[in-house]
Amino acid sequence: MTHPNELPLSPLSALQFYATAPYPCSYLDGRIARSQVATPSHLINSDVYTDLVKAGFRRSGVFTYRPYCDGCRACVPVRVPVDRFEPNRTQRRVWKKHGELIATVAPLHYDEEHYALYMRYQSARHAGGGMDRDSRDQYEQFLLQSRINSRLVEFREPPREWPEQPERPDAPGILRMISMIDILGDGLSSVYTFFEPGLPHTSFGTYNIYWQIEQARSLKLPYVYLGYWIRESPKMAYKANFHPLEGLIDGAWRVLDPTGLDLPPVDLAIHGKRPPFKP
């Protein structure tokens, strides 16, 4: 269903916006969700997507969406302002701990080793959720299809000596983490990250966000977009540890209280009360 009062202004006037049918929320048990989808996907290039992200949209493959739920606004788009980021003691410790990891930035591409790590991660972290049964095609559609400026970042340990395999002097170090990012006009957008799940107390996810912040700084980009934060979701709690954290509230970006106590009520009938769509 198109919402005329939320049609975009130029240069997005060629896009249309539709609300999906209701479906079970994947973040909060017992809730019903809907999404607003931007179409057609072939018109969403990097410049257009930058404006959409600033308006609270995200992407999954070539599918660009934002939450559009009846009576709920628990999902808050969040971003870190790079120049004002202040790492806490734990984040500095994690940064130092994984300082030897070698990050390689590459175009999106399929690699059997990456897919194997993805499946280990899903089986350990999201068992029974469906993604732990993703086929190669589903993996590629989810993470390797993009119409914008996207990159795959591979994190490996430094190469080691292989005395038992002297024929492999240039063997890469052990793969620890893969991160997909989008390069926007005003920042980096974190798409998805998966890492070796069998290692305790690694905090790879925290290191990855810290790395993205430093990468954005080196590219002179002002923001790192972290997707959605839900105060009631333990899986998303780590995002609130990055300070300052800005959230998109009622159409405007502002600094959030780390506790989330300054957020509007989650249960609120908001259809018909949103501000006009103005990216």
Swiss-Prot record:
Q: Which GO terms describe its cellular component?
A: cytoplasm
Recorded catalytic reaction(s): these are: N-terminal L-glutamyl-[protein] + L-leucyl-tRNA(Leu) = N-terminal L-leucyl-L-glutamyl-[protein] + tRNA(Leu) + H(+); N-terminal L-aspartyl-[protein] + L-leucyl-tRNA(Leu) = N-terminal L-leucyl-L-aspartyl-[protein] + tRNA(Leu) + H(+)
The domain of life is Bacteria
The protein's enzyme class:
transferase
User: What function is annotated for this protein?
Assistant: Functions in the N-end rule pathway of protein degradation where it conjugates Leu from its aminoacyl-tRNA to the N-termini of proteins containing an N-terminal aspartate or glutamate.
An example of a GO molecular function for this protein is: leucyl-tRNA--protein transferase activity
Which InterPro entries does the record cross-reference, listed alphabetically? Acyl_CoA_acyltransferase, Asp_Glu_LeuTrfase, N-end_Aminoacyl_Trfase, N-end_Aminoacyl_Trfase_C, N-end_Aminoacyl_Trfase_N
- Recorded name of the encoding gene: bpt
What name appears for this protein in its UniProt entry? Aspartate/glutamate leucyltransferase
A Pfam family found in this protein is ATE_N
Q: Name one GO biological process term.
A: ubiquitin-dependent protein catabolic process via the N-end rule pathway
Q: Does the keyword Electron transport apply?
A: no
EC number(s) per entry: 2.3.2.29
Family indicated by similarity: Belongs to the R-transferase family. Bpt subfamily.
Alphabetically list the UniProt keywords: Acyltransferase, Cytoplasm, Transferase
| Localization (cell) | Cytoplasm
- The answer to whether UniProt assigns keyword Ligase to this entry is no
